[in-house]
Amino acid sequence: MARKILVVGGAGLIGAGAALHLAEHGHAVSIAGRTPPNSKALSKLPFVRGSFLEDDITDAQLRGFDSLVFAAGNDVRQLPPGEDEAAYFHRANSIGVPAFFARAKDAGIADAVYVGSYYSYVVPERVAASGYLRSRQAADDGVRALAGPDFKVCSLNAPFTIGYVEGVIALPIDASVRYLLGQYGGGGPRWMIPGGANFMSILSYAEAVEGALERGENGKGYLVGDENWSFAHYCELLMDALGIPGKIEVRDAEHPSMPDFGLYAGRGATVAYEPDPDMLTRLRYRRHDAERAVREMAPYYRKLAEAA
């Protein structure tokens, strides 16, 4: 059944991928954010200007939708200069995200998906020491606590998500490509930190969003994912897709394209897991799609790097 869906954070990689996928599958999708997206494909979708933190997405606007996909959790990119990190993330994520979902529930939205972070699921022992991780866990818990007979909500907790949408720049991917192209990093042999992560294409994630809206268990937090790769293997796949010969050295040092402040599992940690079979049966997203995503995104990010 076609739905009227609002995607908050639709200008980011995950939100954009979900919005376009849902629109391609016959849903009436609008995206919401502070500024219109810089993407030809996304610009074809209706745009709702506003910030969930400022309450300027009105209740009347929310009442026009059947479903909500929320991909606007705040991270270091939104942290205002000079502001206390823990206090900001508590206000934006711990408090702001569940409050927005409560408004959506009160407005009559029937189904919602929260795009969460996988860290509290895979390294729960590190949550207490990080204001950011505490805020993402609190947002996830707070959103799912709103589940009820008239409001179906679940979370999809994302791993390292890769791919591209024209006009959208995912900074971690952009940084890795620029490093491999030699645009920064000091020259010398290309290297990467030890450890690894679970990687997932934005198409697989978008299919998981669609599955969650249609068949997700109310109040459930899902740990989604696809392929377990070392960071070195990921960079070698990127090098191959970029046409760069050679292999990646592994060094236990802070990396220019993957700095320690963004490694919430810790430098050298390997986050590896297999998605739950029951979840896969319910959400029905494709597997083993991450390598395709690397091959397809590499020319796009090369073009961005060479135009800079």
How does the language model describe each region?
Residues 86-135, 154:
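Conserved Rossmann-fold NAD(P)-dependent oxidoreductase catalytic core, especially the SDR/UDP-sugar
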Residues 196, 202-264, 284-308:
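Mid/C-terminal beta-alpha module of Rossmann-like enzyme folds, strongest
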Residues 8, 32, 71-72, 112-118, ...:
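SDR active-site strand-loop-helix element
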Residues 116, 143-168:
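Conserved beta-loop-beta element that borders a ligand/cofactor-binding pocket
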Residues 39, 45-95, 121-124:
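NAD(P)H-binding glycine-rich loop region in Rossmannoid oxidoreductase-like domains
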Residues 5-25:
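N-terminal Rossmann NAD(P)H-binding glycine-rich loop of SDR-like oxidoreductase domains
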Residues 163-177, 212-222:
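Glycine/proline-rich active-site loop of Rossmann-fold NAD(P)-dependent oxidoreductases
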Residues 177-200:
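A conserved pocket-lining segment of Rossmann-fold NAD(P)-dependent short-chain dehydrogenase/reductase
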